[in-house]
């Protein structure tokens, strides 16, 4: 994002585990400060991860971008070299953004002390999650 790349990240409002949710949220501030646009999907739970590049290549799957997913967990991703499919995934993301709330710098900095405490505690556990 700092180099001008359009980075948009969507996290679910309903977590599969509270520690995972709060650990994830603890990194949002850094991403927003770097220029990424971060959203909370208000319409349920998202598990699949999708990355699209320039409308031509996509990567979709369940793997998180962490050491546990790469070396310990059994996760799978598909790399798709199809402009048509990639553009459909981008359209789906755009549609999901209409069901999401953007996390602004201002909103992130106004979090309560309780929320900040949950985030910091969960962030300590993030290598294990």
Task: Map each language-model feature to its residues.
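PLD/PLD-like phosphodiesterase catalytic module centered on the HKD motif
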Residues: 1-129
């Amino acid at each position: 994002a700092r180099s001008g790349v359009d980075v948009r990240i969507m996290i679910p409002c309903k977590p599969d585990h509270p520690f995972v949710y709060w650990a994830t949220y603890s990194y949002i501030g850094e991403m927003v400060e770097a220029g990424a646009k971060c959203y909370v999907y208000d319409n349920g739970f998202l598990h699949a991860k999708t990355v699209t590049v320039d409308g031509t290549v996509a990567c979709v799957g369940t793997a998180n971008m962490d050491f546990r997913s790469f070396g310990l967990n059994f996760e799978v991703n598909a790399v798709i070299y199809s402009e048509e499919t990639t553009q459909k995934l981008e359209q789906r993301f755009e549609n999901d953004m209409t069901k999401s709330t953007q996390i602004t710098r201002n909103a992130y900095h106004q979090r309560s002390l309780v929320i900040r405490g949950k985030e910091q505690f969960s962030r300590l556990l993030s290598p294990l999650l």
